[in-house]
Amino acid sequence: MYQWIQRDSDVHQRWIWCRRLLIVSLVSALMSVLQVIVFRFVDPPLSMTMVGRYLEAWSDRQWNFRLHYVWCDLEQIAPSVPISLVAAEDQRFPFHHGFDFDAIKNALGRHSRGGHLRGASTISQQVAKNLFLWSGRSFVRKGLEGWYTFWIELFWPKRRILEIYANIAEFGDGVYGVQAAARRYLGKGAADLDESDAAQLAAVLPSPRHYNIQHPGPYIRWRSSWIQRQAKQLGGSAYLDMH
């Protein structure tokens, strides 16, 4: 009799914990969706990438570290910038729904042939990662990135995705957004950037802390020219206006 009672008690405790876990999971899911909805209308004061950079600096005792981040509406950014970002990072941005399966397939194909496995993240995925998640590589983070990307594409227009991307992308150590980068490295505002300037900013995005916008090396000069050619082939800023 005692064993039956104990067994029923164990089953009851398990059910309580399962129910609590389910409630926590549902609340977390709803909160994440609410985050996405809020930032559809509210400009983010910081991103998780910026928070992570602050923590990294403090852990290294860099007490004087400062972020350079100035929000700039897309209307106040030169038309050359969005198309340069798309040409550099995600040329199918107007057409996909957050995931570029062709790019993923091509990346895996190159890797299977012995090439380096390059990322195939879309601009939408990069926004999800930079705005809401931590740095690093893990299946958990990648899964959450996919979750946030789905809701971003559902609730945000492409224009809003590109606007937030242009503002939270890192262009140098502690320098976030086109406006801050333009002022710090090029001595002008985001509204005054020409095609060459925009391509030069976009060229460092694979490794913004490794490359220098003010003193570009051969690779950045080559990549900047390539981005300008790609932007023209896509049709310039009209490529984004049409979609």
Curated annotation (Swiss-Prot):
UniProt keyword list: Cell inner membrane, Cell membrane, Cell shape, Cell wall biogenesis/degradation, Glycosyltransferase, Membrane, Peptidoglycan synthesis, Transferase, Transmembrane, Transmembrane helix
Pathway entry: Cell wall biogenesis; peptidoglycan biosynthesis
Domain of life: Bacteria
Catalytic activity: [GlcNAc-(1->4)-Mur2Ac(oyl-L-Ala-gamma-D-Glu-L-Lys-D-Ala-D-Ala)](n)-di-trans,octa-cis-undecaprenyl diphosphate + beta-D-GlcNAc-(1->4)-Mur2Ac(oyl-L-Ala-gamma-D-Glu-L-Lys-D-Ala-D-Ala)-di-trans,octa-cis-undecaprenyl diphosphate = [GlcNAc-(1->4)-Mur2Ac(oyl-L-Ala-gamma-D-Glu-L-Lys-D-Ala-D-Ala)](n+1)-di-trans,octa-cis-undecaprenyl diphosphate + di-trans,octa-cis-undecaprenyl diphosphate + H(+)
Similarity section: Belongs to the glycosyltransferase 51 family.
SUPFAM superfamilies in the cross-refs: Lysozyme-like (SSF53955)
EC number: 2.4.99.28
Chain ranges passing through the membrane: 21-43
Membrane topology: Single-pass membrane protein
NCBIfam families named among the record's database cross-references: mono_pep_trsgly
Function: Peptidoglycan polymerase that catalyzes glycan chain elongation from lipid-linked precursors.
GO function term, MF aspect, one: peptidoglycan glycosyltransferase activity
One cellular component (GO) term of this entry: peptidoglycan-based cell wall
The gene coding this protein: mtgA
Lineage of producing organism: Bacteria, Pseudomonadati, Pseudomonadota, Gammaproteobacteria, Lysobacterales
Annotated PANTHER family: BIOSYNTHETIC PEPTIDOGLYCAN TRANSGLYCOSYLASE, MONOFUNCTIONAL BIOSYNTHETIC PEPTIDOGLYCAN TRANSGLYCOSYLASE
Top EC class for this record: transferase
Subcellular location: Cell inner membrane
Example GO BP: cell wall organization
Cited InterPro entries: Glyco_trans_51 (IPR001264), Lysozyme-like_dom_sf (IPR023346), PBP_transglycosylase (IPR036950), Pep_trsgly (IPR011812)
Main location: membrane
A Pfam family assignment: Transgly
Name of the featured protein: Biosynthetic peptidoglycan transglycosylase
